[in-house]
Amino acid sequence: MKIRNKIKIKVNGKKMLFDENIMVINLVKKLKIPLNKVAIELNKKIIDIKKIKKVKLNNNDILEIVHFIGGG
């Protein structure tokens, strides 16, 4: 059995562990966050939602995910 290395990512202020080669898209899906009406910030820079499949996370990254909800 292969042991995967883990990395620490702070997601919305909460420290979490993930496999070391995780991409932003996979993390968002793992957390069951819908991709429509969402803004993602990685280390204080907004990620273009069209490019999240290509963005790999690194140890000690800080990710902020904001999901917009309609209403009045």
Explain the meaning of each model-derived region.
Residues 1-71:
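Ubiquitin-like/PB1-type beta-grasp interaction modules and other compact soluble beta-rich domains
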